[in-house]
C-alpha cells in the first residue's frame, strides 16, 4: 500500500456527497432551522423566488434561481436576520393541462405528482425553505383568494369584459397568451397560430400608470435596465387625443399622437389586430395575414374641408390605433406603398386636403392630453386548468359576482379532456346555475384566470401558518416589503410588472398597506445549452437529478453560483461542475489535514509539551489580515448580490490558507501557535463556505470539532447584524 501524498491527510474519510448530503438535510429539518415567524426586535429578511411550473423534473434552468436565493437566505441568517424563505408551485396553466392530455391523466394528479417530485429535488439540492408555507396553486384554499382578489378588482371597476382577438392554436385547440406564442407559432406544438375573437376579461393597468411611473425613481434596488423597460412599457406620452368619426359606423376611432406637428402629413390610420375594427373584419372571416385595407374610412377636419383617412389593419399585436404618414420612413412608407396611399401635395389646385389642428380642436376631434402605451391586461383564458372566473352571466342582470361565501368556485374534476375545446363550456353541472342577484337561470363564466393572476402571492407566504387569510395586515406588515425577489429576466414585462400594479390596487382598495412590494429585484440571465435557452420544450434541458447523482449537490451549487454574474446568461457545461467538484475535493483534504495537525498538537500538549506563547510574527499577522479582509469582501459581495465574486473571494482566501500552511510546515516541526491560527482561520473559512456548499460545510465543521450546525451559526467576526434577539439566540464565534 502506497504512502499518502504529502498534501493529503493520513486518515481523511472519503468524500461521498450522495451519503453525507441527505444526512445533513435531515439534521436541518429536525432542527426546524428554516421555520420563520415574526420576532420583534430582530431585523427581518424576506426572500421570494419565482415559483416553477410543475410540469416535470427540475432542470438546470430552474436551479439557478433557487440556488442563488438559498445562498442569500443562508448568508442573511448567519448575519443575524430573521429570514423568511419559502416557495410554491405554479401548478395551474396551459402547460400542465396539455401535459395531462398527452399523459391521459387528470391535471390535478399530474400537478400534485410533479410538485411533490420537485419538492423532493429542492430538498436534495439543499434548499432551506420554510416547508410549512409551501403551497400548490391548484389547491382550492389558495385559489379561493385568487378569485376573491378578482372580485374586489371587478367591484372597484378595475376589471371588465369586452370582445378582443386572441391567439388560437388549432393543433392544441386552446387560446394562447402572448408569452406562449413564439415567432407566430405555438410554443408547444410549433403550429402556426391564428386569431379568433372572444369575450375576454381585462384589468385596467393604465389606471395606475402614473403612480407606477413615478414610483420607479424610488426603486434604488431594481436594475436600471428593468426600470427603463417599465418606463417604455408604460409609455407616457404628452400629445393629442383624436376622436375621428368612421363613415357608416356609430362608434368612432380614438388614437393618440405624440407630437402635434405630425398631424398635417397624416394620410391613413393603422390599427393592430386586436382593435375592435380589426375584430369586426376577423369576425367576417378575414384573416389578417400581413395587412388589410378596410372599407371603413375615418374622417378628420381640415382647413379646406373634411379629410378622408383609409384604415389599415397592420400586422402588429395589440388594440392600438395610430396615425400614419406616407412620407415617414419604415413601416408607414411600406404600408402606404402597398395600398397606394399617396403623400399630400400642397399647392396643387389650391389648398391641400390635410388634417388641421385648429379645425380639429374646434370640431371636438382633437384634445391636448397625456396618453400611454400601456394596454389593459388580459387576465383570463378560454381553457380548463385554472381558477374559474367567479362571475355568473344572467340575461337580465348581466355579469354578476359570485357571493364571497360561495368561494371558491371549484373546478369540476369529472371533465372529458379528450373533447376539443374548453370542457367547462360543456359541463352542465358547472355551467348551469341560478343568478345570485335575481334567481333566474344563468350560466357560469367558462374562462379561467391565467398563470399570472395572483401577483400578490407573497402575501400567502408571509401569513401565519395557522390562518387562511393572506391579507391580514399585521401578518403582512411584519414581513413586507419583500427584501429580495429573484426570477428570470424574461419576467420583466409580466410578473415583475404585475406585482407592482396589483400592490397599488390592493392598497387603493384598502386591502394592503404597501405600494412598492419589492425592495430589491434580481433579474437573472438565462441558462443556455449550446447557446439556446434551456427548456423542456426545446429538448435541451440538463437533468438536475443526474448531475447531483454524479457530482453531488454542493458541487452543482458552486458551479451555478460561480458561472457568471446573476444578471448575465450562462452557457451550461458539465465542466463547470467537474471543476467545482475538484475544488471541494481539495478543500476536503486540506481541512482534514488541518484537523489532524491540530489534534496532534493537542495530543502533544496533553503529554506535557505545552506550546510556547508569544506575539504573532509577520507570517501570523499576514494570515490574520488575509482572514479579516477575505471575510469583509465575501460579506460585501453577498450584500451586493455579486455571489460569483463572493465565491471567488472564498477561493482566494482558501489559497491564502494553503500558502500559510505551506510556510508553516517549512518551519518544521509545526509551531503550536501557527497551528492554532491556521485551525481558527480554517474554521472561519468553513463558516464562510456555508451559504455556498452547506452540506460539505457541515461535515467539515464537524471534522474541526465545531459545535452545533453551520446553518445555525453566526457569521464570523464583527460583520453581523446586531439585535438583542439575535445575540441571545446565537453563539458568538470565538
Segment roles from a protein language model:
Residues 140-158, 171:
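Hydrophobic or amphipathic alpha-helical targeting/insertion segments
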Residues 117-130:
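A glycine-rich helix N-cap at a beta->alpha junction
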Residues 84, 342-347:
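Short hydrophobic alpha-helical runs that function as membrane-insertion/retention elements
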Residues 177, 194-195, 330, 402, ...:
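Short functional micro-motifs and their immediate structural scaffolds
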Amino acid at each position: 500500500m502506497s504512502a499518502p501524498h504529502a498534501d493529503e491527510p493520513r486518515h481523511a474519510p472519503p468524500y461521498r456527497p450522495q451519503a453525507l448530503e441527505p444526512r445533513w438535510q435531515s439534521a436541518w429539518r429536525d432542527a426546524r432551522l428554516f421555520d420563520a415567524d415574526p420576532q420583534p426586535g430582530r431585523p427581518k429578511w424576506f426572500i421570494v423566488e419565482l415559483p416553477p411550473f410543475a410540469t416535470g423534473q427540475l432542470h438546470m434552468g430552474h436551479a439557478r434561481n433557487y440556488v442563488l436565493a438559498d445562498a442569500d437566505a443562508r448568508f442573511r441568517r448567519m448575519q443575524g436576520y430573521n429570514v423568511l424563505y419559502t416557495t410554491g408551485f405554479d401548478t395551474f396553466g396551459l402547460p400542465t393541462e396539455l401535459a395531462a392530455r398527452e399523459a391521459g391523466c387528470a391535471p390535478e394528479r399530474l400537478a400534485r405528482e410533479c410538485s411533490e417530485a420537485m419538492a423532493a429535488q429542492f430538498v436534495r439540492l439543499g434548499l432551506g425553505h420554510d416547508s410549512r408555507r409551501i403551497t400548490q396553486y391548484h389547491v382550492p384554499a389558495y385559489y379561493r383568494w385568487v378569485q376573491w382578489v378578482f372580485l374586489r378588482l371587478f367591484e372597484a371597476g378595475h376589471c371588465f369584459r369586452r370582445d378582443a382577438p386572441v391567439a388560437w392554436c388549432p393543433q392544441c385547440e386552446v387560446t394562447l397568451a402572448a408569452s406562449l406564442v413564439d415567432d407566430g407559432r405555438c410554443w408547444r406544438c410549433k403550429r402556426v397560430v391564428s386569431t379568433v375573437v372572444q369575450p375576454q376579461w381585462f384589468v385596467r393597468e393604465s389606471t395606475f400608470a402614473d403612480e407606477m411611473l413615478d414610483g420607479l425613481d424610488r426603486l434604488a434596488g431594481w436594475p436600471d435596465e428593468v426600470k427603463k423597460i417599465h418606463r417604455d412599457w408604460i409609455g407616457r406620452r404628452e400629445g393629442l387625443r383624436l376622436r375621428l368619426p368612421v363613415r357608416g359606423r356609430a362608434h368612432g376611432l380614438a388614437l393618440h399622437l405624440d407630437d402635434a406637428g405630425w398631424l398635417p402629413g397624416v394620410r391613413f390610420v393603422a390599427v393592430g389586430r386586436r382593435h375592435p375594427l380589426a375584430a369586426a373584419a376577423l369576425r367576417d372571416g378575414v384573416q389578417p395575414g400581413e395587412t388589410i385595407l378596410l372599407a371603413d374610412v375615418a374622417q378628420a377636419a381640415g382647413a379646406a374641408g373634411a379629410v378622408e383617412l383609409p384604415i389599415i389593419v397592420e400586422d402588429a399585436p395589440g388594440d392600438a390605433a395610430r396615425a400614419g404618414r406616407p412620407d415617414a420612413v419604415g413601416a408607414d412608407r411600406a404600408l402606404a406603398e402597398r395600398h397606394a396611399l399617396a403623400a399630400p401635395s400642397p399647392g396643387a389646385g389650391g389648398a391641400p386636403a390635410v388634417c388641421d389642428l385648429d379645425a380639429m380642436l374646434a370640431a371636438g376631434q382633437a384634445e391636448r392630453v397625456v396618453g400611454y402605451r400601456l394596454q389593459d391586461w388580459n387576465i383570463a383564458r378560454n381553457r380548463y386548468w385554472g381558477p374559474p372566473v367567479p362571475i355568473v352571466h344572467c340575461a337580465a342582470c348581466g355579469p354578476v359576482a359570485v357571493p364571497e361565501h360561495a368561494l371558491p368556485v371549484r373546478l369540476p374534476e369529472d371533465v372529458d379532456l379528450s373533447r376539443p375545446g374548453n370542457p367547462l363550456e360543456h359541463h352542465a353541472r358547472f355551467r348551469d346555475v341560478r343568478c345570485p342577484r335575481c334567481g333566474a337561470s344563468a350560466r357560469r363564466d367558462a374562462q379561467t384566470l391565467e398563470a399570472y393572476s395572483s401577483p400578490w402571492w407573497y402575501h400567502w407566504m408571509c401569513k401565519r401558518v395557522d390562518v387562511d387569510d393572506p391579507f391580514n395586515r399585521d401578518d403582512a406588515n411584519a414581513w413586507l416589503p419583500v427584501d429580495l425577489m429573484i426570477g428570470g429576466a424574461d419576467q420583466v414585462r409580466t410578473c415583475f410588472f404585475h406585482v407592482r400594479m396589483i400592490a397599488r390596487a390592493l392598497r387603493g382598495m384598502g386591502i394592503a398597506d404597501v405600494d412598492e412590494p419589492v425592495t430589491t429585484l434580481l433579474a437573472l440571465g438565462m441558462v443556455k445549452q449550446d447557446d439556446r435557452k434551456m427548456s423542456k420544450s426545446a429538448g435541451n434541458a440538463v437533468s438536475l437529478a443526474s448531475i447531483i447523482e454524479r457530482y453531488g449537490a454542493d458541487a452543482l451549487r458552486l458551479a451555478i453560483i460561480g458561472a457568471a454574474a446573476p444578471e448575465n446568461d450562462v452557457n451550461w457545461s458539465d465542466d463547470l461542475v467537474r471543476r467545482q467538484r475538484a475544488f471541494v475535493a481539495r478543500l476536503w483534504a486540506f481541512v482534514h489535514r488541518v484537523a489532524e495537525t491540530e489534534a496532534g498538537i493537542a495530543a502533544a500538549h496533553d503529554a506535557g509539551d505545552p506550546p510556547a506563547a508569544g506575539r504573532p510574527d509577520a507570517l501570523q499577522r499576514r494570515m490574520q489580515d488575509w482572514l479579516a479582509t477575505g471575510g469583509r469582501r465575501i460579506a460585501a459581495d453577498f450584500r451586493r448580490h455579486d455571489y460569483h465574486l463572493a465565491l471567488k473571494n472564498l477561493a482566494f482566501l482558501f489559497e491564502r490558507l494553503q500558502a500559510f500552511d505551506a510556510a508553516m510546515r517549512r518551519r518544521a516541526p509545526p509551531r503550536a501557535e501557527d497551528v492554532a491560527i491556521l485551525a481558527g482561520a480554517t474554521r472561519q473559512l468553513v463558516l464562510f463556505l456555508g451559504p455556498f456548499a452547506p452540506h460539505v460545510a457541515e461535515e467539515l465543521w464537524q471534522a474541526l470539532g465545531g459545535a452545533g450546525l453551520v446553518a445555525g451559526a453566526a457569521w464570523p467576526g464583527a460583520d453581523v447584524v446586531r439585535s438583542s434577539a439575535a445575540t441571545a439566540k446565537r453563539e458568538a464565534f470565538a
